[in-house]
Amino acid sequence: MNIPYLVSLLSSACALIIGIVIHESAHALAAYALGDRTARSRGRVSPNPLNHIDPFGTVLLPLIMILAGGPVFAFAKPVPVYVNNLKNPRRDEVLISLAGPASNIVLACICALILRGMPGATLVSPLSSGVANLLVGFLFTAMSVNLSLAFFNLIPLPPLDGSSILVLFLKGRALQTYYEVQRYAMPILIVVLYVLPSVLHIDLLDWYFGVTVDPLFLGLLRFALGA
């Protein structure tokens, strides 16, 4: 049994579950604040992961991707929003969509603040022994996972939040074309995440994270370490 690998996997899984719960609860809270009580009445503002987990998107799909050895992504149950209850439906849908990724970025910043306040905190492996070292390693992992979760969800393909945001800026034929493309969202994601890197050695996700997640993570890392 590969204990170090299991510890690392458990740390990442815990960070991902926490990130997903915060992400989905933020959607529900934003909807409630903007006039729609549906998600809150259905228990979506809750720390209980079972209220947010989608059996396929949160459990089965990530397991398949881990076994396949490629990038891993997951999605939770969609937060129910009835646009007729919103004060300004077109604007509020975008704000609700942005609330999820924004909450993950805030959570990553909170992790950095906690690390900054920990005496003698240094960049350690999440596999290091000792409770303090395990906590430090987990916080660094949580920073990375939450930033990745935030920016991955901003990709403009359903069921990701970026799809709802992009619609605000499209009109006419462009909007119609986008709705047609949405039907092929999952095949497109599979091509981008697996086919292009393995066949053509073109890793669009790595490039995208390189210009979004990496600079922000390095900035938070310097802040956390007092560098």
Report residues per predicted region.
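Hydrophobic transmembrane alpha-helices and their immediate loop junctions
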Residues: 1-227
